[in-house]
Amino acid sequence: MKKKQEESSLEKLSTWYQDGEQDGGDRSEKRRMSLKASDFESSSRSGGSKSKEDNKSVVDVEHQDRDSKRERDGRERTHGSSSDSSKRKRWDEAGGLVNDGDHKSSKLSDSRHDSGGERVSVSNEHGESRRDLKSDRSLKTSSRDEKSKSRGVKDDDRGSPLKKTSGKDGSEVVREVGRSNRSKTPDADYEKEKYSRKDERSRGRDDGWSDRDRDQEGLKDNWKRRHSSSGDKDQKDGDLLYDRGREREFPRQGRERSEGERSHGRLGGRKDGNRGEAVKALSSGGVSNENYDVIEIQTKPHDYVRGESGPNFARMTESGQQPPKKPSNNEEEWAHNQEGRQRSETFGFGSYGEDSRDEAGEASSDYSGAKARNQRGSTPGRTNFVQTPNRGYQTPQGTRGNRPLRGGKGRPAGGRENQQGAIPMPIMGSPFANLGMPPPSPIHSLTPGMSPIPGTSVTPVFMPPFAPTLIWPGARGVDGNMLPVPPVLSPLPPGPSGPRFPSIGTPPNPNMFFTPPGSDRGGPPNFPGSNISGQMGRGMPSDKTSGGWVPPRGGGPPGKAPSRGEQNDYSQNFVDTGMRPQNFIRELELTNVEDYPKLRELIQKKDEIVSNSASAPMYLKGDLHEVELSPELFGTKFDVILVDPPWEEYVHRAPGVSDSMEYWTFEDIINLKIEAIADTPSFLFLWVGDGVGLEQGRQCLKKWGFRRCEDICWVKTNKSNAAPTLRHDSRTVFQRSKEHCLMGIKGTVRRSTDGHIIHANIDTDVIIAEEPPYG
């Protein structure tokens, strides 16, 4: 029991003594000497194989210590602040990553514990046990140093600007650093930095008391800046911990960024106080800059850029992995910008490696960013310089000061900003170029003496029915569509208009007229209060005036088809000349059948059948009102019957002849005894006109015992009597130019047995022929 108490007291004393040794950074050499001595004694006491392995592991630890120290010192010269960020990551990520150094140190510590246990069991002397405990403690310290160095080396490799990090790693580091609220006071942050400096001094670094005071002041300032807007935690997630005192130690690094590096430049906005090496290290380490007004990109060296192929745009290395920025109100943005401007004025970080163009860009971007703060879609100070590998700095693709925007190829004007400034909108070209009118004049505002309604004192406004999109007058541009246009047509002469068709003369029926009196075809009606001097159309020039008829557009003699320049507009040609479109259909008869031998053979057989079986037609001239149709009248029944009754429609086709022509009513036509003279089987052809006769003719076929089997259409041409006059009256709306013939069949016919009445159906159901003079 006595020995156990003495051993426990000795362990406590050795622990206190070891903790006291840790407070002094100058005793690292003593610890190494004691480690060597204890290792030598333990190797002499333990077995041969174990001592060799232990000595080899100690020597490996020392070699690794020296190599990692040299590598870390060399990297700290180039990446000063990245080591500080790696220290902070080590403290914030308390239970985070487990490296290969941990496994090595844990194995060594286990072996040390085993050897220490053996030493305690072999010797019970106080001095030896004390030395063993000292060796254990020093070995633990060395393993902890090894773990911190391995983490530092890994973090340095991760923070290298030539090594890309994934978006997931960067976001995890941002989340760990940004949301680490365990250090609520600057004293706690200072304690963490003090412990990290002790580890560094145990490896041979001695920064001095001046560096320690400067670090403490920088940490306090950093804590005040970080916790000044603690209520806005979500927006400050990406606010990073960096040591401002370390930035003062590296003014030389900012100046060493020569013109060769400046040619590769960076893409930045409104400069903040974070313009020095800290922002470079943080942006290259994959950390988000979402709460900074500046985006600084560490570009690749010449050899690295030259090896790649791609468009001549700025290559976004790590800033493309930023999380989406949350919106903040205008007061917080203004306060943050003011704070960043004060920091830049106090510390002057914006002067390292910058030139006069950056300062000019800062002034102009501050001016434009302040104007766009009240707009939600704008991100102030987002991009101010776009750099390409072969052109250097370029002006931003957006409004800069009072200069107009300059669009680029790969992205819309202004980048991600959609601010609506005083953008000069291009005036669209006049849509009335084909009208042969002079260019539009500027818009004149209405004076109090001018009438807002169209009249003689106001120039009419031409509005096409299919106009482009209107650009209403406002801050962005002017109206490019509401343009005053001089009148195209001359005003109508006063007094009643002349006769519409002077060649026809006054019709006998005064109630029949072609156009409303007092108006001209194509001109405005004489309504009271109307003064329409322009024609609302699709931009086609007017070819008629109020003076009378003008020559047709084609300019050629009547009877010829319109030229290709008239776009084959047969309808317009019919209005101009009276020539119907069907007048220009060619090859109406089956004359050119030499190229079709089968068709020629079929036509020959058809003609033979017709000539062999056809009989001479029979007719009876008489008044069917008085003569009743019956088989006894003719002595036979007929296989084919043609009926052409005088429909009322025929009378109204020829103006002025209705008094001398008599027409039958529908009741008179349907009461004919056609079924009495029709044989079975038989066919009936009934002309019904082009109006109501189509339906009435079907009723007649049904009463007479026929069913409709075909509808033959007669397209009437007027090559011989073409005239620009439209022969219609108030009963018709369109000009009728065709007629229909309904074909009915009674009974059943077969080609095999009824060849005398039916044959090969090679004829078409369309007839194109000239019409008679009176329709």
UniProtKB/Swiss-Prot annotation:
Q: Where in the cell is it found?
A: Nucleus speckle; Nucleus, Nucleoplasm
Which gene is the coding source of this polypeptide chain? MTB
Provide the disulphide bond pattern.
none
Q: Where is this region: Disordered?
A: 1-424, 520-569
- Predominant location of this chain? nucleus
> Any idea which UniProt keywords this protein has?
Nucleus, RNA-binding
Q: Which GO terms describe its biological process?
A: embryo development ending in seed dormancy; methylation
Going by the entry's taxonomy, the superkingdom of the source organism is recorded as Eukaryota
Q: GO molecular function: any one?
A: RNA binding
Briefly state the protein's biological role. Probable non-catalytic subunit of the N6-methyltransferase complex, a multiprotein complex that mediates N6-methyladenosine (m6A) methylation at the 5'-[AG]GAC-3' consensus sites of some mRNAs. Associates with MTA, FIP37, VIR and HAKAI to form the m6A writer complex which is essential for adenosine methylation at specific mRNA sequences. N6-methyladenosine (m6A) plays a role in mRNA stability, processing, translation efficiency and editing.
Cite the InterPro entries for this sequence: DNA_methylase_N6_adenine_CS (IPR002052), METTL14-like (IPR045123), MT-A70-like (IPR007757), SAM-dependent_MTases_sf (IPR029063)
Q: Where is the composition biased (Polar residues)?
A: 375-400
- Compositionally skewed regions (Low complexity) per UniProt: 40-49
| Knockout or disruption consequences | Embryonic lethality: arrest at the globular stage of embryo development.
State what protein this is by name: N6-adenosine-methyltransferase non-catalytic subunit MTB
Oligomeric and partner information: Forms homodimers. Interacts with HAKAI, MTA and VIR. Associates with MTA, FIP37, VIR and HAKAI to form the m6A writer complex which is essential for adenosine methylation at specific mRNA sequences.
- The residues forming a coiled coil are none
